[in-house]
């Protein structure tokens, strides 16, 4: 069984036992989180598509850890102007593990 969920403004295809990084969530490490914005649930040939979300469906997850991604360097240069800007950014994320998908 798989599901397509929406969290942090992005969509992810998840299955039971999968670990993935999502936008930072306000939850302690080791706590359970229920995600209810389920766009699609599929099992073999049987597929339920939400409009926009599947009613009564949820994905139970456990928060594994919080962390920060690799640094992204933003470099802007203006030719012939002797002007340049260098800026770095590290995005916060939450690593979750999918425990169960309930349709």
UniProtKB/Swiss-Prot annotation:
GO MF term set: rRNA binding; structural constituent of ribosome
Role this protein plays: This protein binds to 23S rRNA in the presence of protein L20.
Name of the protein in its database record: Large ribosomal subunit protein bL21
Subunit comment: Part of the 50S ribosomal subunit. Contacts protein L20.
One of the record's GO cellular component terms: ribonucleoprotein complex
Keyword annotations: Ribonucleoprotein, Ribosomal protein, RNA-binding, rRNA-binding
Record flagged with keyword Ribonucleoprotein: yes
UniProt keyword Ribosomal protein, yes or no: yes
Family membership: Belongs to the bacterial ribosomal protein bL21 family.
Organism: Maridesulfovibrio salexigens (strain ATCC 14822 / DSM 2638 / NCIMB 8403 / VKM B-1763)
GO BP term, example: translation
């Amino acid at each position: 069984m798989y599901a397509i969920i929406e969290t942090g403004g992005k969509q992810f295809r998840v299955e039971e036992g999968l670990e993935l990084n999502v936008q930072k969530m306000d939850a302690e490490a080791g706590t359970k989180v229920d995600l209810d914005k389920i766009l699609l649930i599929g099992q073999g040939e049987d597929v339920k598509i939400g409009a926009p979300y599947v009613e009564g469906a949820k994905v139970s997850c456990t928060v594994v850890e919080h962390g920060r991604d690799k640094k992204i360097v933003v470099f802007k240069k203006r030719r012939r102007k002797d002007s340049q800007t260098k800026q770095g950014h590290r995005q916060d994320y939450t690593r979750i593990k999918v425990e169960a998908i309930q349709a």
